[in-house]
Design a protein with these regions (language model features):
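Alpha-helical oligomerization segments
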Residues: 174-203
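Short acidic DE-rich linear segments
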Residues: 202-210
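Leu/Val/Ala/Ile-rich N-terminal alpha-helices, chiefly Sec-type signal peptides and the beginnings
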Residues: 7, 12-53, 59-62, 68
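General "foldedness" signal
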Residues: 38-41, 81, 183
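Long, low-complexity or tandemly repetitive, helically biased scaffold regions used
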Residues: 52-177
Length: 210
């Protein structure tokens, strides 16, 4: 959609390259930061840059002088409206943060783990689904089924031959042992990113439009 890109002050050239996938990932980060603020009593917005931008852009009021609860409810509603995200997706993030972030010092290691998890996961998906990703975006059920199989392979299959793939697979499994996301959460997350990526302009299309 690009609406966050516009609201966050990015120029038109940047907007055309961002679109729904970047908006989605931004909102996921906002939700993580809102949960962290709620659980750990963080009131310094400078520590939570994505949450600060979201709060200021959408003028989300602070509830009961506590940063987090109002912003958490707002971004949850936004993601439901735009991406049809279900409650379980948010509940699993809440549970993961509750399990892993007991004190302020836990925040950075946790966020690094999540970043590593998503980067390795999406690299693997791109590698393992590279031919399947040519399926047109309107075949939603087929894309979901292929995503489900790929994620199941990442967690279950032990016969990969490429050393880089093997290393990334082991990394994803180790990250998720700590993060604690269910397989369905991972499948839904990957499916959303893949679906949004398919809607974005290809480099050739961007060149033609210039």
């Amino acid at each position: 959609m690009g609406f966050l890109s516009k609201l966050f002050g990015k120029n038109n050239a940047t907007q055309s390259k961002t679109g729904g996938m970047e908006d989605y990932m931004t909102l996921v980060r906002v939700y993580f930061q809102a949960v962290l603020a709620t659980r750990l009593g963080i009131n310094n917005l400078a520590m939570l840059p994505d949450l600060r931008t979201y709060k200021q852009t959408f003028r989300v009021p602070t509830l009961n002088n506590k940063l987090g609860p109002g912003e958490k409810a707002s971004v949850r509603k936004t993601m439901k409206n735009i991406y049809n995200v279900d409650d379980n997706f948010f509940d699993e993030i809440d549970a993961s943060i509750k399990k892993n972030c007991k004190k302020m010092q836990d925040i950075q290691p946790y966020l690094y783990q999540f970043q590593g998890f998503t980067q390795d996961l999406m690299m693997l998906v791109g590698n393992l689904m590279k031919f399947k990703l040519r399926v047109p975006g309107f075949f939603k059920k087929a894309i979901y089924t292929m995503t489900e199989k790929t994620v199941n392979d990442i967690y279950d299959k032990n016969s990969f031959s490429d050393p880089g793939v093997i290393k990334a697979v082991m990394s994803v499994r180790q990250y998720n042992q700590r993060l604690g996301f269910s397989r369905k959460w991972t499948i839904d997350f990957v499916y959303q990113v893949v679906s949004l990526a398919k809607k974005e302009p290809k480099p050739a299309e961007e060149a033609e439009s210039k």
